[in-house]
Amino acid sequence: MLGAVTVLVEACKKNDLTTISSRYHPTYLSFKIPAGWPQPPTDIFKTNPLTEEGFQLGKKLFYDGRLSKDGNFPCASCHQQFAAFATYDHQFSHGFNNSFTFRNAPALFNLAWMKEMHWDGGINHIEVQPLAPITNIKEMAENIGDVLKKLSIDSVYHRMFAAAFGDTAINSQRMLKALAQFMGSIQSFNSKYDQVKKGEASFTIAEQNGYATFQAKCNACHTEPLFTDNSFRNNGLSLDPILNDQGRMRITGKPADSLAFKVPSLRNIQYTGPYMHDGRIFSLSQVVAHYQTGIDISQPTLDPLLKNRLSITNQEKVDLVEFLQTLTDQVLLHDTRFEQPN
């Protein structure tokens, strides 16, 4: 009798899945590449079609503390929308059991243009990226199996997974795909700088002068329009003896990559401080000052472009900071589409 009941239950499950699949009509979304921007190096949605249902599921997961061990550290705890999905005013990420990481949380936008992620490039696909913080003992400190168990007892998730993927199965692949759809949709291309480029606004005199300085002194690494060339470079920061963070060399094992870190985008830089891979600098003026006088030119792996440091006047420095603030995308910072769901 028990066997018959088991067969009946399994049959019902299969019928339920078939019924849901027959009703699977997702709302497909297009991924916008702004005019004049390069094509992304890879199509992150090629095997993970972007849908409204997948996006909404990914957003719910992104803000859900149950992805962490104690429920207190969702992805959004370190990637806050008002800080361009970086961590506002915190040098290091704060995680489970009152732990801290040894790096500053990078901003999450325009990820479709990144072949490698993290300061050392240790992640090479957006669908893999969430695994690192979820399983890191100093961040979310959870294992994927337990995350899935917690999600599986929530009927809302059953409905959302079915809407996004065609049936109620909740597994790691689908969870990561949904997160990738949400994170990959976070784009920044609506700053004053972008409006100026489209002829919809004008720089002030100070901003225009700062832009000229930027083009002459900074654009080689922070290349427009992404304001990064996505390379890894040693920018002359002294090695913190406690952190002993060797940067890219931790991934490649190559001495030539010692102290090299990913060049961050300068978009939204007004709101993504503190700055550098370890958050050691707390103002844009101090960032510029580092390139003027703080570079350790004795380092053998120092990027050649920085050997002569940055030579600019005090007024050029002020104007440069004024220009950098035109890269703030207020649309992104306040877009209700990316807000925490109810």
Language-model-derived ranges and their functions:
Residues M1-A4:
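Sec-dependent N-terminal signal peptides
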Residues C12-N342:
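Periplasmic c-type cytochrome electron-transfer domains
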